[in-house]
Amino acid sequence: MVPAAITNIHEAFKEIKHMTIDTWQEECRLAARRAMKEVIEHRMHNGIDAFLEQMRDAGLPDRRNGSFSSHLVTEVGNLELRIPRTRTFSARSILQGFARRTASIERTILMCFLLGLSTRKVGPALLSILGEPVSPSTVSDIAKQLDQSVQAYHQRALSDHYEVLIVDGIVLRRKTGAGAQRRTMLVALGITPHGKKEIIDFRQVPGESKTAWEGFLNHLYQRGLQGDALKLVVVDGGNGLLAALDLVYGQVPLQRCWAHKTRNVLNHVKQGDQDKVKRALHRISHARTLREAQKAAQRFVLQWEGSYPKAVECLQKDLPELLSFLQVKTGLLPSVLRTTNAIERRFREVRRRSRPMGTFSDRTSMERILYAVFMHENLKQRTATPFLLLTQND
């Protein structure tokens, strides 16, 4: 694995420290418990050594006197620990001090991997951050289980209850043997009849070609998302995506994103007229009925065709698909249906949280970070799949 390109590790931890670890697969939590056990028991043994040295310096002889079992409840589960003791002292006080730090330690162990640190570099990073060593075998075990969690997410069965599907791509920079290169992540977000938004899946590809999109969408279809409940697919355009959607979800009405279309139209308008044109477009996109929107579009053409024929052409060529949201029967708000804003907000979160890391170190680090951010966002919507129930998403 290529070493991570992290500009400032402390800033990186600061950015992602609030991400939850509640959704990690049980095997990953087991590995984290093992690492916690090593860290805490090492600290207790060091504490006993320091105590015995102090006693010798004071002329008060003492010696080790075995250990006893104790439990510590943590975010990743119950730890069974061996508490070392001497004839006059036990390390229980050290354990009590650690009880106040367990949450941050657990997150630190997992976040080292989310940050894209190589297995070789996680141990030294943990030593500098925690002041405690974690064995290479434990580090390797955590990395393996974390990646298994990501793969389980990509392979889980999908239910077919979404009313709206939003699909888009995000471009990120990744290190390769030929230097930093741009890599595209294809992402699908579903919206339930109750308005809950969930990142369904993502896939890393070289670019947004028809073949790449078709493979991604077919994988969703084969896992259960066959589109029987879908009323709308929202996109920002792209010939490859449109061709793939026609093959996989051709029966579902297509909605073009009004935010993207507005920007594209304004590209053909002089700066001094952009506010007026934008207001005219707003009257179309925010019309309450299809008929009202069509009339507003007619007025737009009459008003601006002479001055900005390319702007008018840009609008007219996609107008039917821009107004699809006014023709579907759903309880969802129009603001949810007419743009890809829901998925764009999550893309901004990915960029914000990954900015301190610079360029992603490799494909694995990119997968881990997107998985962590998207699971965090899904949890806020109460749509994250518990990993013990990965056979079917909610």
Regions found by a protein language model. Give the residues of each.
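Acidic/histidine-rich catalytic cores and adjacent linkers
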Residues: 1-4, 12-20, 41, 45-49, ...
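DNA-recognition alpha helix
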Residues: 120-131
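RNase H-like nuclease fold core
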Residues: 64-65, 78-87, 93-104, 108, ...
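Short alpha-helical segment immediately N-terminal to, or the first helix within
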Residues: 111-115
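Conserved beta-strand -> loop -> alpha-helix junction used to position metal-binding or nucleic-acid-contacting
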Residues: 232-239, 244-280
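A polyampholytic, Gly/Pro-enriched intrinsically disordered region
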Residues: 161, 272-289
